[in-house]
Amino acid sequence: MKFETPSRFKFTPYLEREYQFGLDPNRPLCRGFLQFDGCPRGNSCPDKHLAPTFLNKIVCKHWLRGLCKKGLNCEFLHEYNLQKMPECQFYVKNGFCTQSPDCQYLHIDPASKIPVCFNYEKGFCKMGPECSRKHIRRMPCELYMTGFCPKGRVCEFAHPKFVGIYDYMIIKPNPKDKAKDETKQETKEEALQ
């Protein structure tokens, strides 16, 4: 006698209705929920209810294991997206991962987190190779150097910042000289009349 497990439990409809479990993640978005900030059908609606806080978040670590109890009220993403996965803490601490390449968390290169050296971007860093910041070598943009680059920030070449290099001294006129100029102006006006 062969024993088969049931594919659905008695409480499965309750989970689908109350927590949206087991529903197709690719189902269409509910228009009523998007337009009116609420669906009249509530939890019995077969369409997807997406809150605006859902967008651009990291994936819920509990949902990945099938243990998230918040359902649609969860502030994290319930979608398998490799770019939005939480960062692998083991990789952060040790520089390698024992689960790699099967690790479902994000592995970010530690060198990419080092901030850019502003002095090197301007043209010269006196710290040289001992600098704790990142030195990125890029060719300067010829168009930018001659005055204007139409590509702007999306240009693949460097646009060096010349902040603070040309600090000219501001010359203020002497108050006595200003008074002399005013008297000269008055005499010219009198002569014209």
Curated annotation (Swiss-Prot):
GO terms for cellular component: cytosol; mRNA cleavage and polyadenylation specificity factor complex. Signal peptide: none annotated. InterPro entries: CPSF4/Yth1, Znf_CCCH, Znf_CCCH_sf. GO terms for molecular function: RNA binding; zinc ion binding. The keyword RNA-binding applies. It holds the Pfam family zf-CCCH. It is found in: Nucleus. One of its GO terms (biological process) is mRNA processing. It comes from the Eukaryota. Keywords: Metal-binding, mRNA processing, Nucleus, Repeat, RNA-binding, Zinc, Zinc-finger. SMART domains: ZnF_C3H1 (SM00356). A zinc finger (C3H1-type) spans 24-52, 54-81, 82-110, 111-138, 140-162. Belongs to the CPSF4/YTH1 family. Component of the cleavage factor I (CF I) involved in pre-mRNA 3'-end processing. This is mRNA 3'-end-processing protein YTH1. It comes from Yarrowia lipolytica (strain CLIB 122 / E 150). The lineage of its organism: Eukaryota, Fungi, Dikarya, Ascomycota, Saccharomycotina.
